[in-house]
Design a protein with these regions (language model features):
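Hydrophobic/aromatic beta-strand patches that form the interior of the parallel beta-sheet core
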Residues: 1, 27, 145-147
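A conserved short coil-to-beta-strand element within the FAD-binding core of flavoproteins
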Residues: 1-14
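A structured beta-alpha segment of the ubiquitous adenosine-cofactor-binding alpha/beta core
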Residues: 15-19
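Short hydrophobic core segments
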Residues: 21-33, 162
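Active-site substrate-recognition segment that forms the wall
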Residues: 30-143
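C-terminal catalytic lobe of FAD-dependent flavoproteins
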Residues: 116-184
Length: 184
């Protein structure tokens, strides 16, 4: 296993090599940074920033709670994750005070127990044009694939969709038409 920035210039799709590594298949799962991928940069993926809070409190249900505009997810003893915001076409990775206050205001409408904010986090979702994940093969390179568009709703489907992707790659089992990138 290696962790490095991918250098597209080092990918040779004729010899199926990346630097010194030979491959049978290559799968890109780059999230919102797919726009930097010369093989798939035409896909309708846009960045959608989201911010979360982590809180500590006693007396809140240990069950996942949806309060209409925010969720309260248990992540440990007396710890919860609160989210989330949606800032379209924003790929900055800095949490903002305005979104923190927005989450606190929404949380206060449903949680009456005292709590302490211990973390304020943000990330960027890869949002597809139709908010449905994108899976499939490159139109010209038969062993190059993509799994993308796993925004906030689709991320829960990731285990199933990646299994479907492997079945498609290895056994040529068709992908569900709803997620097949050929729809674009």
């Amino acid at each position: 296993t290696r962790l490095e920035d991918f250098d597209y210039r080092s990918l040779d799709t004729t010899s199926n090599t990346y630097k010194t590594i030979s491959y049978k298949y290559i799968v890109f799962a780059e999230g919102y940074r797919v726009s930097e991928n010369p093989y798939f940069n035409n896909l309708p993926i846009s960045p959608t920033k989201g911010e979360l809070l982590e809180i500590e409190a006693e007396g809140i249900s240990d069950e996942f709670i949806y309060l209409g505009s925010v969720f309260v997810q248990p992540i440990g003893k007396n710890k919860w994750r609160i989210g989330s915001t949606y800032q379209q076409n924003d790929s900055s990775l800095n949490p903002t005070d305005i979104m923190k206050e927005d989450l606190i205001t929404k949380l206060n409408k449903g949680v009456t127990k005292p709590y302490k904010v211990v973390k304020h986090l943000c990330g960027v979702r890869p949002a597809s044009e139709d908010r449905i994940p994108l899976l499939g093969v490159h139109p010209d390179i038969e062993n190059m694939f993509i799994v993308n568009g796993m925004g906030s709703k689709a991320v829960s489907m990731a285990p199933l969709l990646t299994t479907e992707m492997v079945n498609y790659m290895v056994d040529k089992v068709p992908l569900p038409k709803e997620v097949d990138l050929s729809r674009f």
